């Protein structure tokens, strides 16, 4: 009986090293546009609890974007003035938490002339 109680208690206990959810972008609409174009990024774990900042990156330069709206599955932003026409950027997220990380996303946006 005592063994059964210990076993149930062990199985019900949360893991000692629970990992924070990782933000992930799965799509951006539209996929191209001019500076000033509003974009909607969809994915998971995109709320303020997990995402501190959003960037466009070409692998050399990172351009911070202003997040206008944000919830668990969407972020709305505008393509900033520093973006260069003709460049196809990846989205990049700065996470929150004890150990913030910059994570490049598999989602791209092309800035039009």
PLM features per residue range, with description:
Residues 17-113:
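Ser/Thr/Pro-rich low-complexity tracts
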Residues 4-6, 16:
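Cleavable N-terminal signal peptides
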């Amino acid at each position: 009986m005592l063994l059964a109680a210990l076993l149930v208690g062990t199985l019900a206990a949360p893991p000692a090293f629970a990992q924070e959810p990782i933000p992930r972008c799965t799509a951006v609409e539209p996929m191209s546009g001019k500076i000033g174009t509003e974009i909607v990024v969809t994915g998971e774990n995109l709320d303020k609890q997990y995402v501190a900042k959003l960037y466009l990156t070409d692998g050399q330069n990172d351009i911070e974007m202003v997040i206008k709206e944000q919830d668990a599955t969407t972020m709305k932003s505008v393509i900033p003035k520093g973006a260069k026409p003709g460049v196809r950027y990846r989205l990049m997220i700065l996470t929150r938490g004890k150990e913030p990380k910059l994570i490049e996303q598999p989602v791209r946006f092309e800035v039009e002339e």
